[in-house]
Amino acid sequence: MQRPKALITGASAGIGKTYARKLAGRYDLVLVARDAARLETLAAELKAAGASSEIIAADLTKSEKVAAVERKLESDPAISFFLNNAGIATVEKSLQTSIATIERLVALNVVAATRLCLAAGRAFTARKSGTIVNMASAVAVNPERFNAIYGGSKAFLLALSQGLTRELTENGVIIQTVLPGATRTEIWERAGTDISRLPPERVMEVEELVDAALKGLELGERITIPSLPDYQDILDAEAARLKLSPNLSRNHPAARYR
């Protein structure tokens, strides 16, 4: 009997690689990242753990590479878990961020993430089951703390997840958004900073992060902030957001504007 498959973007290192290791006991893997050699090494490791892996070497800032992953998501009925994890960050001052960096960041964190989320959503809706995990960031709800462009891209992914929740849920699809804080991965080095400059009590190890995110999924959380002590804070924030809903569109301005 064929095992279900999990497709993971950004699978060659950090969060994606750790998810692959954690899921290998239950899923075969489709591993997506730019670095084919790293993916081959990971696939060999996972094979020893009993999981077969398919490799898709792809730079997801390129539209044609995103299209290849879209086709895989929509054509392989064994795929039932999608980790939307590929992303880049920048620590430059927002106003000094280069056009090249902006375009690459938006292409990966927004355009590719959206296209793949929707492809998975279409595929899983047709099959009436499946799980999408969108890897956002804590700066999605606290954008003042980091580069505004990066924070904006992660806020977009959170909003996309929230907007899709009802449509997906009624078709048997689970969508979870994970909002990590600072996590010890290569994204910091690639962004041009040293994570050791951050207070150690602010930095989570990647294995702990992934364990918490998977536990949150098991608990039925649709938004998971691994470092947040009280989940009621998320529920309260969501309730406050939804409280605005009845008055967001009216035929006249509020009384204070008259």
Where are these regions (language model features)?
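Conserved glycine-rich cofactor-binding loop
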Residues: 10-13
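Conserved glycine-rich Rossmann-like NAD(P)H-binding loop of the short-chain dehydrogenase/reductase
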Residues: 26-41
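Substrate-binding pocket helix/loop in short-chain dehydrogenase/reductase
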Residues: 93-104
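Residue(s) in the substrate-gating loop at a strand-loop-helix junction
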Residues: 137
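C-terminal helical subdomain
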Residues: 177, 193-233
